[in-house]
């Protein structure tokens, strides 16, 4: 019995990459309170949703690493973070794209925000655009541009109303299908 188990343990501890056909299908969404408001709408469209109020972008690095290590990271990873003020570091975005690997697609969703914070919003969205340009497996979903002019989608400039939740979930669904 030991002779059979030992090689299996050695192979697993080396961390051999899973073949593309063994990656779980579907979409895994990581977000903060903005996505939290639309969790039911996204779940109804087939997303697995991992949200936490006030989550920062850098927290997504650990989430992606853990999910991948446990074989639970889906083929498509949607990240909508950056609303809460800590600027996105290029290294965090690069790490997420690298860890996801070439058989997965990472979708970065641009942020909206109250007009009193336009510099933060612009910086976050600019950093996401740059990351998407650097990595072949990473795409930008421009929620900021799509939602402009739809004040009735937000009750405070960033958090979603009922109408906004439907629009948000539909937009993410269309751009990740």
Report residues per predicted region.
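Short, flexible active-site-adjacent loop segments at beta-strand->alpha-helix junctions, enriched
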Residues: 83, 112, 144
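Sec-exported extracytoplasmic/periplasmic mature domains
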Residues: 39, 43, 82, 98-105, ...
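Catalytic His-Asp segment of secreted/periplasmic serine-dependent ester chemistry enzymes
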Residues: 118-177
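Conserved beta-strand termini and adjacent loop/short-helix elements that scaffold enzyme active sites
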Residues: 30, 50-52, 109, 141-146
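Active-site segments of SGNH/GDSL-like serine hydrolases
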Residues: 96-123, 147
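Conserved SGNH/GDSL esterase-like catalytic core that processes O-acyl groups on lipids
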Residues: 23-95, 115-123
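Hydrophobic/aromatic residues located in beta-strands of well-ordered beta-sheets
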Residues: 27, 77, 105-106, 140
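Secretory targeting and sorting signals
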Residues: 1-22
């Amino acid at each position: 019995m030991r002779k059979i188990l030992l090689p299996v343990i050695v192979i697993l501890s080396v961390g051999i990459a899973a073949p593309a056909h063994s990656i779980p299908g579907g979409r895994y969404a990581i977000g903060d309170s903005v996505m939290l408001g639309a969790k039911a709408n996204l779940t109804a469209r087939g997303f697995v949703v991992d949200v936490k109020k006030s989550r920062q972008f850098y927290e997504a690095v650990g989430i992606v690493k853990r999910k991948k290590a446990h074989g639970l990271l889906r083929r498509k990873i949607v990240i909508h973070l950056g609303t809460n003020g800590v600027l996105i570091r290029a290294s965090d975005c690069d790490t997420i794209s690298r860890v996801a690997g070439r058989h997965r697609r990472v979708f970065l969703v641009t942020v909206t925000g109250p007009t009193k914070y336009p510099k933060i919003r612009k910086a976050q969205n600019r950093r996401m655009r740059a990351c998407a340009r650097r990595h072949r497996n990473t795409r930008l979903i421009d929620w900021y541009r799509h939602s402009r002019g739809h004040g009735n989608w937000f009750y405070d400039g960033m958090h979603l109303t009922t109408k906004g939740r439907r629009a948000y979930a539909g937009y993410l669904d269309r751009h990740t299908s």
